[in-house]
Design a protein with these regions (language model features):
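Conserved class I S-adenosyl-L-methionine
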Residues: 96-105
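Substrate-binding/catalytic lobe of Class I Rossmann-like enzymes that use SAM or dcSAM, i.e.
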Residues: 221-303, 311-317
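Core SAM-dependent methyltransferase catalytic element
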Residues: 274-275, 326-340
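N-terminal auxiliary segments of SAM/dcSAM-dependent transferases
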Residues: 2-52, 60
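Class I SAM-dependent methyltransferase Rossmann-like catalytic core
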Residues: 46-91
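Conserved SAM-binding loop of SAM-dependent methyltransferases across substrates and taxa
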Residues: 106-121
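Conserved beta-strand signature within the Rossmann-like core of class I S-adenosyl-L-methionine
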Residues: 199-214
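A short, conserved alpha-helix within the catalytic core of class I
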Residues: 184-196
Length: 340
């Protein structure tokens, strides 16, 4: 079956060694180019830059730094829950599961899940799905630390990777979507994303998703306006990336990080505020951009949820809720669901 998957879905297989292989589409229609997306998003009435563009090498390093900041509660509270799951999650698993992660990580969170699998299985199969080829780098770090680990990476969109997995074999999957990335979706896009996950799941598969919870406004706003200004640097770095990769002339001194909590829509809204009237050339996007003083470029939404809303959302998509875990302070949640 594995050979037919490669042929039918036009994937090329790369074998690194006996424990590491990955699949990559021969050709992909997955995304417009960076230049095209930037041109389209910066010519709308509400100018925006998609949050996926934060994560170049420097942006990824800054985000790792954000995760350890005292004000940034999501990472440490999710880790607290994952530690709790060391004894509770095995009740829902058996030796026939493999671990599938949307995104690739050598982080402590991925390792906490792998630790659970080491207690259940002699051989652990881990399938990270990530559009970035950093996937191979993080995989090698994990293989160095887990003797019984075998990794099959899929370098594709989440949707493409899950379709690939559907046709790969009949093994049961525990699919992870950790962190609070789901909160970056609009309500409609988030619902559509969950529908795609649900339709890609087989009977017996499980899905574990992290969702940030509604809480005190001061806690929320402090998490995105840290005292060391790392989040501000992270936000501004996307302009540096556009300068470097798209031959643009953004002057970062003329922009300021701006993050507020929108209580009505239950979301943090992150922007770059123009401090002056200014013109910017983005050569590779064939764009001449004019920004007025105080005009905002939207860079990220991060939606927050009530537990009742999580239940309603997941069941409305067609999931059966197995369990919802919270940290002791009820700041963050991990929900385990199956296909109904």
């Amino acid at each position: 079956m594995h050979n037919s998957v490669q042929k039918n879905l036009n994937y090329k297989k790369y074998v690194i060694d006996s424990k590491l292989q990955y699949f990559k589409p021969h050709a992909t229609k997955i995304e417009k180019t960076f230049a095209e997306e930037i041109r389209l998003s910066l010519t709308k009435n509400q100018k925006s830059i998609a949050p996926k563009f934060f994560y170049d090498k420097k942006g990824s390093a800054l985000f790792e730094k954000i995760c350890s900041l005292p004000e940034y509660y999501p990472t440490r509270t999710e880790i607290m829950i994952l530690k709790k799951l060391q004894t509770e999650l095995p009740d829902f698993l058996d030796h026939s599961f493999r671990l599938v992660e949307l995104g690739s990580g050598a982080s402590i969170k991925t390792r906490l899940l792998l630790d659970i699998f080491t207690k259940l299985q002699d051989r652990i199969d881990y399938f990270p799905i990530d559009i970035s080829e950093i996937l191979t780098e993080s995989s090698e770090q994990l293989l160095a630390d887990y003797d019984d680990l075998h990794i099959t990476g899929i370098i594709d969109t989440y949707e493409g990777g899950l379709k690939f997995l559907q046709n790969f074999d009949d093994k049961k999957n525990l699919i992870l979507f950790l962190g609070s990335s789901f909160g970056n979706f609009s309500p409609d896009d988030g619902y559509a994303f969950l529908q795609k996950i649900n339709s890609a799941m087989k009977s017996g598969d499980l899905f574990l998703i992290g969702l940030d919870l509604v809480k005190d406004v001061q806690i929320l706003e402090s998490a995105y306006n840290d005292s060391q200004c790392v989040t501000a640097e992270f936000n501004l770095n996307v302009l540096s990336r556009i300068n470097d990769e798209l031959d643009a002339d953004f002057d970062l001194i003329n922009f300021k990080h701006h993050a507020i909590y929108n209580k009505e829509d239950q979301r943090i809204e992150m922007y770059l505020r123009s401090l002056v009237n200014q013109s910017v050339i983005i050569s590779k996007s064939n764009l001449s951009l004019y920004l007025q003083k105080d005009e905002l470029i939207h860079t990220e939404y991060s939606r927050k949820f009530q537990v009742s809303q999580i239940r309603e959302l997941l069941t409305s998509v067609g999931f059966k809720i197995k369990n919802i875990w919270l940290d002791d302070g009820e700041n963050f949640s991990l929900s385990l669901v199956s296909k109904n």
